[in-house]
Amino acid sequence: MAPVLSKDSADIESILALNPRTQTHATLRSTSAKKLDKKHWKRNPDKNCFNCEKLENNFDDIKHTTLGERGALREAMRCLKCADAPCQKSCPTNLDIKSFITSIANKNYYGAAKMIFSDNPLGLTCGMVCPTPDLCVGGCNLYATEEGPINIGGLQQFATEVFKAMSIPQIRNPFLPPPEKMSEAYSAKIALFGAGPASISCASFLARLGYSDITIFEKQEYVGGLSTSEIPQFRLPYDVVNFEIELMKDLGVKIICGKSLSVNEMTLSTLKEKGYKAAFIGIGLPEPNKDAIFQGLTQDQGFYTSKDFLPLVAKGSKAGMCACHSPLPSIRGVVIVLGAGDTAFDCATSALRCGARRVFIVFRKGFVNIRAVPEEMELAKEEKCEFLPFLSPRKVIVKGGRIVAMQFVRTEQDETGKWNEDEDQMVHLKADVVISAFGSVLSDPKVKEAMSPIKFNRWGLPEVDPETMQTSEAWVFAGGDVVGLANTTVESVNDGKQASWYIHKYIQSQYGASVSAKPELPLFYTAIDLVDISVEMAGLKFINPFGLASATPATSTSMIRRAFEAGWGFALTKTFSLDKDIVTNVSPRIVRGTTSGPMYGPGQSSFLNIELISEKTAAYWCQSVTELKADFPDNIVIASIMCSYNKNDWTELAKKSEDSGADALELNLSCPHGMGERGMGLACGQDPELVRNICRWVRQAVQIPFFAKLTPNVTDIVSIARAAKEGGANGVTATNTVSGLMGLKSDGTPWPAVGIAKRTTYGGVSGTAIRPIALRAVTSTARALPGFPILATGGIDSAESGLQFLHSGASVLQVCSAIQNQDFTVIEDYCTGLKALLYLKSIEELQDWDGQSPATVSHQKGKPVPRIAELMDKKLPSFGPYLEQRKKIIAENKIRLKEQNIASSPHKRNCFIPKRPVPTIKDVIGKALQYLGTFGELSNVEQVVAMIDEEMCINCGKCYMTCNDSGYQAIQFDPETHLPTITDTCTGCTLCLSVCPIVDCIKMVSRTTPYEPKRGVPLSVNPVC
């Protein structure tokens, strides 16, 4: 009997065992069975788990805010980029948060990092440790929505980490005169005490201002202050701190370790005698605030302050911090941590990594009064730390030279808000180790004496002006913890930033110079910012290739003026006509597209408009063009004009536009709606003969360049472009919007619907949804007409997409929908992004990057994961019993490394230098054309197959489903582990990669065996090719 071809074979049926099927009846399964099922598939922590995960010597990143590229892009695209954004008002260092998030969403990670470091020299550190819920995130407008606020800290960390991986040094402000031509004031000697966040920030800004003799004196043999010694490695790695210090040193700042502010070493008086013109004190609060009940207790007895414990942990876990490797403190048994701030929680989670069996966090007040950020508390809770509120320490019990317990009394708050201690309610807790985290003070008399003659306040701290950070001694400034204003790293950074300007102002005054009334601190610069992105086209010099399309952003010339002020290189006017052809628009007329699905707000992938050309007169536009060219001679202004098929009309309007001073003309022969009914726009642009003649008329009328704007609503756009060239056009714009009907409501009415009758017409679709159409138009024109100038438009919303059009053969880039999604300031992102993309092409070490995206490492939740198959010849997913196995294997490996005294190697910063010339815009135009051709030119011998990275796989089975119901049934899906496996029947179609939610979890690799198609029925004749 002949086999039934339309039924799956037995082996395929086996593969399809877990493939979704439509439900025909309710499913029955007992509660007890479902409880077992739940345990098998569980990914989050089990509430009934009493065994703490072994964390000894595990200093891997534990932050919930950490993001990989996939997560960062999704989060950045979710951001609204609000007007007058509240998040920015809540940031101590005044970061332009919405702008750096815009850059991340556009995959311009350098642009984001530049924006961050410009206002915060410790931008990576702050991205990791900032208490964002109390700061920027607390003001996020998305708190008013179901999905909640943006993970700003995670985005900041991601962008700055990518820049760190670029290994590009900071450079001196390029707008400053050469050092030898700077005034004498900039050679003034400046001293800073303490190499912590406040001093690093202050020194960085002073160096950016141009000061060349800046020295930081640090008491310890390591740098970074509390960022190094007290914030644990799993929250802030040492190589991050070192990276930011190296950025500062790129500007010539010197650091001398082993020198402290003390009467025994250096004082303000001796500093002044040595010729220092200004000093900044940023030494923090070096001594612990120790309760009287702990006097006389030692580490050997099991007592630590946070100032003792955390530096010991840091030295044992932070590779590169010290010259020699130090062991972690050995903590065993039960630990009591006293305090409820971030430091207390750092002590608790660090104790677990030093071997503690159980950790109790004890504090005087209730949960609602905990000062630590919620993330820190949540992490401690997840690691099974216990919380004991309303307890005040009374006595430490010592037996046999070791701490064995502590006594506490209960605290209560009365109706007036006052806290009282109830001696009748005693609590006795057994413990082996006690860690006090009750804050820090400045109590060393030698340090205070060294600060003489500055005044101190009633808290024993230097008295400063909170605006200028100036002490009672005009030449001495202070900031950070030591002055008591800053409570966080980011606030310390801002203290140093604030002080830098007023130090600058003070020094200049000492040399008889003045500074601007409004502070103007320089931005962060690298060699990327020096890249030239100007380009010439049709004899015109464009300062950058980005301009306004003839559309809504150019509705008026005052808008064009604002665009030029923002940095746009050129602009087209909105299309205008002779007065006899003037139009009046309908409303509504511009609507969001349906191509983004139910995603509302910015970032729309398409818009549809039924807007006609400008309602303003030709006289308005011509006078305005004259004004713009007078005020912006370096910017290109292109007048966009439209007439019916009438030689006299085209001649008249073209001459008027040329006489106005326009640099060039764009002939709108492609408006897809409305104007065609008047014999204009599309009515002319779809016929090569009409296009050729109109171009000839305009060529006869004017001397300036002109470009024909092409419509994609034709069968062969090249024939239209060729006709324009034959008619004398200097180039073409490709393309205008695509004619379409965006959507219908459930009652059959369209949107937009005009008037009571709710009628509509086909409109023009714009945005990233039409980018594939625009890319085809540009490449096909560039291939057919080599060297013929092309102005690209259609879905350009970033430097990355702009580069695609340059590679396709365009010379300049017109933007509309991206501005509708945001505002004119996106130009800054586009320019820095394009400069970075060009610069990175010259770095040999980064050739495996895709633009600004680093090569993907195996990760889960944005964090690198150890390859279990390398530690144990076994593949394990990350859920249920397999997750527990993974944790056990990792824990055993961490302990093995500790026992073998294997320390992680310190990361050394090696700056990458270009090995080849940085390409110009001209160099990259048309680069992609060599790869385009006919299907017949493609190889059907060089085949690929899919390869899955099991460590990155989240076991969703999307690859399995699409292969089953849209492909070749070439993926097996394990019923227990949900790990997919590619079979040898894979044809390399790439559908699996296309639907996979994890970037680079699936890759296509070369097929090692010949590809033999499954024909179903044997061929009856030999194929001809």
UniProtKB/Swiss-Prot annotation:
A Pfam family hit: Pyr_redox_2
Keywords: 4Fe-4S, Acetylation, Cytoplasm, FAD, Flavoprotein, FMN, Iron, Iron-sulfur, Metal-binding, NADP, Nucleotide-binding, Oxidoreductase, Phosphoprotein, Repeat
Binding site for NADP(+): 340-343, 364-365, 371, 437-439, 481-487
Binding locations of [4Fe-4S] cluster 2: C91, C130, C136, Q156
Binding site for FAD: 129, 194-198, 218-226, 235, 261, 480-489
GO cellular component, one term: cytosol
Annotated residues for binding of [4Fe-4S] cluster 4: C986, C989, C992, C996
Domain 4Fe-4S ferredoxin-type: 69-100, 944-976, 978-1007
UniProt-annotated binding residues for substrate: N609, N668, L669, S670, N736, T737
Matching InterPro entries: 4Fe4S_Fe-S-bd, 4Fe4S_Fe_S_CS, Aldolase_TIM, Dihydroorotate_DH_cat, DPD_II, FAD/NAD-bd_sf, FAD/NAD-binding_dom, Helical_ferredxn
Subcellular location: Cytoplasm
Known pathway: Amino-acid biosynthesis; beta-alanine biosynthesis
Textual note on the cofactor: Binds 2 FAD. Binds 2 FMN.
Record has Transit peptide as a keyword: no
Catalytic reaction(s) noted: 5,6-dihydrouracil + NADP(+) = uracil + NADPH + H(+); 5,6-dihydrothymine + NADP(+) = thymine + NADPH + H(+)
Residues engaged in binding FMN: S550, K574, T575, K709, G767, T793, G794, G795, C816, S817
Residue positions binding [4Fe-4S] cluster 1: C79, C82, C87, C140
Cofactor(s) recorded in Swiss-Prot or TrEMBL: FAD; FMN; [4Fe-4S] cluster
Any GO MF annotation of the entry: dihydropyrimidine dehydrogenase (NADP+) activity
Subunit structure: Homodimer.
UniProt similarity note: Belongs to the dihydropyrimidine dehydrogenase family.
Function of the protein: Involved in pyrimidine base degradation. Catalyzes the reduction of uracil and thymine. Also involved the degradation of the chemotherapeutic drug 5-fluorouracil.
Name the UniProt record assigns to this protein: Dihydropyrimidine dehydrogenase [NADP(+)]
Encoding gene per record: DPYD
